[in-house]
Amino acid sequence: MRYPAKQTTQWLKLVLGSLILFFIAALMLFNPASLITSQQAKNDALIAESMAYHIGVSAYLYGYPLIDMTSQMHNETHLVEDNQDVYAPVNKLYRFNHLITPQTAGNLRAPNSDTLYFQGWYDITQQPLIIHTPDTEGRYFTIAITNLYAEVVHIGRRTTGTEERLFALVTPNWAGTLPDNITPIVTETPKGWLLGRLLVTGSEDFVQANQLVEQIWLQPLGEFNGQPSNKKTEKINAQKYDFKGSLGFFAELNRTLKTLPLRPGEAALLAQFDEIGVGPNVTFNADLLTPPQRKGLEHAIKDAEDIIQASTQRTITSTNGWMISKDIGVYGYRYIHRAAVVKGGYGNLPEESLYPAAVFDENGDLLSGSDRFRIHFNPKQLPPVDGFWSLSAYKLEDAQFEPNSIGRYSIGNLTKGITYNEEGGLTLDLQHEIPAGASNNWLPIPKGHFMLVMRLYEPQQKVLDNQWIPPSIERL
């Protein structure tokens, strides 16, 4: 049926009018303003979560050594648990008056049994700290002064000699004066860690070595009178700090950054930290985080921990079966590398000591006490050191010594009775049971899987330049 043109026009107007009314009603029903607001809220949440995540990863990697150090400082200067292994108030020393054995290792990982340890946590926020060292008459000792950024300076035989000395630990901006007989040692952060080692040459030397360690003491400058203080300090009980893996990490980082001077070249980075409430110019409060911010930071913690764990393998190079880490003690802007090193512990500068380690033999198989091994040094391959060297074996699962029948936990150039061949070479026997022949050169090893750690104190330049490496580990 055909309609006249006039009727067709009226019909189209009616249909179009109805459609317009329908769309107006639909728009009123769906409220475009609410659609825009909803999308904006999603965008804001995405931005907040992404910023918290990306900046949070950077902040976690940057702050890892700071929080590791401040947590340990709190836990070892307060009584935080029953039968605590290490405790000494701030600016006091804790002395291990014994060589490390399986029974006395405490919380030390892969400890040495060649030196007496002593340690303390310093706080020079208000005034310098005096460090007294006695005349060791050439005996090896070292004190590693580690700041909150895990960077190290040394007092000891290599750097300051072995005569009786007085030092003052000061911050870079300290403007006071010291007596002429006190040498300033600058450390970048007002808080940090002192870890000392003093050589013991044998059981008959133990008493004298302990006496020397007792003559190493600390005293705030304002109390200094040339003599160690007998002042008693009150023991303080406290809850244990453990911030890693939680939002408490960022709260502690925020508190710590507020106490530290701005480092050159880091202003922009710390300004970013401010954006998520972690930097030094704001105050972090986990209770005020929005759900997207919380989600982003929690994700950042997990991924940053994974990055650090993966990066621990990049800090070590393997040569001839031995893994040697030389790039420690000074880090600059290499925050991931710094965190990876701290994950495994704190070390001396390479010039002070190096620690080649091995978990595989010359064929790439895991070392196990069910087999026997041999390491042979020809005369020109003996470790080139100005201090001393030694070799120790540890259980692989926990980096601790395993008891053995002769109580020997290291062997090296200072071991009494060690035997060289006619040409001046040296062969070390590594096995769980006592060798059939002479045992002078025997290092007992754990029954199961184990790792070897060689210690090179005051390594010569050829070691630092990779011109010397330990010989391979031969499975017999």
Q: What are the functions of these language-model segments?
A:
Residues 23-28:
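Hydrophobic core
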Residues 1:
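Active-site-proximal segment of zinc-dependent metalloprotease catalytic domains
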Residues 4-21:
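N-terminal Sec-pathway targeting helices
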Residues 29-476:
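A compositional/structural signature for long, glycine/proline-rich flexible linkers
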